[in-house]
């Protein structure tokens, strides 16, 4: 494990952190839940562990029997049958075969009923050890906190009492069944005691720290230190923890897909708005508004109105010729209301109209020059004040952004993906989503206004993320796909490598069930009845029952001298024998080879 050399006695917080909490939230579907993530549901299915417990208990139960008990139970049953069928003694071969078959099959049915009921109590008991939480911890942070406490004696005693009642009720006179139930009751009690003494807490119940001095991970659960089992060692570099887990490796891609989905939702909300308009500065319309107001509220002969009207028209013209035309129109209009001195006092060097035009032109240009200079000074001062205000506003927004996450009374963040569409449209004026205008400097032009209905390719991102989930889960845990005839995947199951990678550490490291064997991959999807049928065919009890049947169901009585044969010999060439036929034997699940040189048993292939 990579790590720096921190100070003496220091520790690094591993969980909870922003990263570790996000990894668990990904499993809960908070960020970009895609179809490929359903593989995790198959991975955390506890059915494989339940089948492993069933195989362990059923196999050990059938192994706890003795040949003497089996033979004693058979002889008791045979004696009881003879008292009920005394006239069948003449048909010696078929009678014995039928009697033994009925005893063997009823023995099997009774054991199946008792053992299945007994083991189901363990499989569905409310033990605190959770295989699902174990898998969640492994695929996120690669380590599992384990809390040890006293066993649940109430649960153990309840199961034990119920099993003893079943044993007394159904197997009071059977030595073999009684011994099997006694052994399985003891094994179940020990197993429930072990499982109920362990607890895997949820990610919100425990904290994990890394002790840099001892190079160990320590958990804290309800103010008590608990053991943390490391399945895959994380990397710790400069106080930063990088987990060695599938979710850690996919974290960047998952969050990128989630942000793309948020972006697409935001674009959808903006494009859903009924109206959109480009709003410009209103200063260009001020002069026209003033003129309209003056025309409506003032008389036409008002000198102030005429002068102000002149100034407004001059401000709208940006060329010298335009200004000249405005001045000439003004002089022509005003000169009609002034008395011509030439008609009263004679002709001079300059007419009244020419003099008035010259005076007005000089006054107007002087006024415009002063006004323009004042406007430039005002604009420069306002730009400086605006820059100062923008800096203060950005500083305040930065302070608010740092204070809002820690403010418990503040409003929660807007989740655009799950919030109501119309409510989200109303929140577009919120500070987090507000569309602000920008100042376009003089001489610049807007090249792209981004007022297009663009929506990010969220479907492609989710499809890529689905493929990434499938590839990561299949390659990391070696899952086996179940496909149909067309090659379409129907489901996934545990392979033998998956059992070794996940179920092995849970069985031997977490649960400490050292006496239990790992399940074979051929049983991971089989029903309990099919597993029980196979285990019975390969059990010690089946071997003992088969041996008793082969010795009892001979047509020629044992140790009887037949001409041409020694004591106890049977004429195998005449097919004068029979063997027990179990229901599974008839279906071809088991084949018991006859003695060397003998023909096969009836009903076998």
UniProtKB/Swiss-Prot annotation:
Protein name according to UniProt: Portal protein
Cellular component, GO, one term: host cell nucleus
Record's compositionally biased regions (Pro residues): 592-605
Protein family according to the UniProt entry: Belongs to the herpesviridae portal protein family.
Known function: Forms a portal in the viral capsid through which viral DNA is translocated during DNA packaging. Assembles as a dodecamer at a single fivefold axe of the T=16 icosahedric capsid. Binds to the molecular motor that translocates the viral DNA, termed terminase.
Domain of life: Viruses
Location (main, coarse): virion
Pfam family, one: Herpes_UL6
Known partners and oligomeric status: Homododecamerizes. Interacts with terminase subunits TRM1 and TRM3.
Subcellular location: Virion; Host nucleus
HAMAP family: HSV_PORTL
GO aspect biological process, one term: chromosome organization
């Amino acid at each position: 494990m990579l790590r720096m050399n921190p100070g003496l006695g220091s520790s690094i917080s591993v969980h909870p952190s922003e990263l570790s909490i996000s990894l668990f939230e990904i499993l809960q579907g908070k960020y970009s839940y895609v179809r490929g993530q359903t593989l995790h549901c198959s991975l955390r299915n506890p059915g494989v562990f339940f089948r492993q417990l069933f195989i362990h208990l059923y196999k050990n139960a059938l192994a706890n029997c003795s040949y003497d008990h089996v033979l004693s139970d058979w002889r008791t049953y045979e004696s009881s049958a003879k008292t009920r069928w005394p006239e069948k003694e003449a048909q010696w071969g078929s009678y014995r075969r039928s009697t033994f078959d009925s005893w063997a099959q009823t023995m099997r049915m009774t054991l199946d009923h008792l053992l299945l009921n007994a083991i189901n109590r363990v499989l569905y008991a409310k033990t605190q050890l959770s295989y699902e939480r174990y898998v969640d911890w492994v695929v996120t942070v690669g380590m599992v906190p384990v809390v040890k406490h006293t066993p649940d004696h109430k649960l153990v005693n309840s199961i034990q009492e119920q099993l003893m009642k079943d044993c007394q009720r159904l197997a009071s006179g059977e030595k073999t069944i009684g011994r099997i139930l006694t052994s399985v009751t003891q094994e179940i009690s020990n197993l429930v005691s072990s499982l109920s003494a362990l607890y895997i807490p949820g990610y919100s119940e425990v904290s994990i720290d890394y002790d840099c001095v001892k190079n160990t991970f320590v958990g804290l659960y309800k103010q008590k230190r608990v053991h943390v089992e490391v399945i895959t060692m994380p990397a710790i570099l400069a106080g930063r923890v990088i987990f060695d887990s599938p979710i850690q490796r996919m974290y960047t891609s998952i969050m990128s897909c989630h942000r793309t989905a948020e972006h697409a939702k935001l674009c959808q909300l903006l494009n859903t708005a009924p109206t959109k308009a480009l709003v410009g500065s209103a200063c260009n319309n001020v002069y026209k508004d003033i003129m309209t107001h003056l025309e409506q509220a003032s008389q036409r002969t008002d000198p102030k109105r005429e002068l102000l009207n002149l100034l407004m028209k001059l401000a709208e013209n940006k060329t010298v010729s335009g200004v000249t035309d405005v001045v000439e129109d003004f002089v022509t209009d005003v000169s009609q209301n002034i008395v011509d001195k030439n008609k009263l006092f004679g002709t001079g060097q300059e007419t009244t109209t020419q003099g008035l035009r010259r005076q007005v032109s000089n006054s107007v240009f002087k006024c415009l020059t002063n006004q323009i200079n004042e406007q430039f000074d005002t604009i420069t001062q306002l730009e400086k004040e605006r820059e100062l205000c923008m800096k203060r506003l950005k500083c305040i927004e930065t302070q608010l952004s740092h204070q809002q996450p820690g403010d418990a009374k503040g409003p929660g963040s807007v989740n655009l993906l799950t919030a109501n569409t119309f409510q989200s449209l109303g929140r577009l004026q919120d500070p987090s989503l507000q569309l602000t205008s920008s100042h376009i400097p003089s001489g610049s032009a807007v090249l792209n206004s981004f007022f297009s209905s663009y929506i990010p390719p969220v479907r492609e991102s989710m499809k890529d993320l689905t493929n990434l989930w499938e590839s990561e889960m299949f390659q990391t845990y070696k899952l086996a796909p179940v496909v149909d005839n067309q090659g379409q995947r129907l489901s996934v199951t545990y392979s033998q490598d998956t059992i070794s990678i996940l179920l092995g550490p849970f069985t031997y490291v977490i649960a400490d069930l050292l006496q239990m064997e790992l399940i074979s991959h051929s049983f991971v999807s089989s029903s309990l009845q099919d597993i029980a049928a196979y285990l019975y065919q390969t059990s010690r009890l089946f071997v003992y029952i088969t041996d008793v049947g082969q010795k009892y169901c001979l047509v020629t009585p044992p140790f009887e001298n037949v001409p041409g044969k020694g004591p106890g010999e049977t004429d195998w060439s005449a097919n004068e024998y029979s063997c027990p036929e179990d229901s599974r034997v008839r279906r071809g699940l088991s084949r018991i080879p006859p003695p060397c040189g003998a023909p096969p048993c009836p009903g076998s292939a």
